[in-house]
Amino acid sequence: QRQMCIRDRSNTESLNIGKKRGFLTIYIGYSPGVGKTFEMLSNAIELFQSNVDIKIGYIEPHQRDETNALAEQLPKITTNFTKHGSHHFQYLDVDRIIEESPTIVLIDELAHTNISRDRHEKRYMDIEEILNHGIDVHTTLNIQHIESLSSQIELMTGVHVKERVPDYFIMSADVLEVVDISPE
């Protein structure tokens, strides 16, 4: 099931003089596993097949074969790696995305906290920078990560969420696409 809210932001300027700010599309769902990344990738493949310059900037590794198969059908921008303790992590390469400057870049997990905080503490800050370079971004978010809703959702679910995205960022989205699993 899908619902879509679209805003007209045709006059939105970026911080770069003369360049329009990129458009932000957020695929939002009530919990992990409802199909946000799958939906984002499915829509991206349709755009790619229509000759839109669309690339994957970062997709969270999934245990779902169907999602991974979709990701394999799209070009990818090389990611960076960092070490934290004994673990190695893959992360978004903001410089490379800006350098390659696709029309649209896919970036999974909007609420993510960056382990390597050399540039920005949070992924939504990375996305803001990319948008300000005129690149459209499609991203995913679980509703419990919205700052103004997280405490209410914690009361209902008993689950505390540390990673939060400020309301102003959500409100800046050009498209909010609600993704939900059918009760069947």
Predicted features, each with a name:
Residues 1-6:
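Short, small-residue-biased leader/transition segments that mark boundaries at the very start
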Residues 7-20:
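Pre-Walker A adenine-sensing motif
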Residues 21-95, 99:
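Conserved P-loop
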Residues 46, 60-65, 111-112, 137, ...:
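Conserved nucleotide-binding/hydrolysis micro-motifs of P-loop NTPases
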Residues 53, 101-104, 133-139:
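Loop/turn-to-beta-strand initiation segments
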Residues 109-124, 148-151:
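Conserved ATPase-coupling elements of RecA-like P-loop NTPase cores
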Residues 122-143, 165:
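Substrate-engagement module of ASCE P-loop NTPases
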Residues 139-184:
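Internal gly/pro-rich beta-alpha loop/helix module
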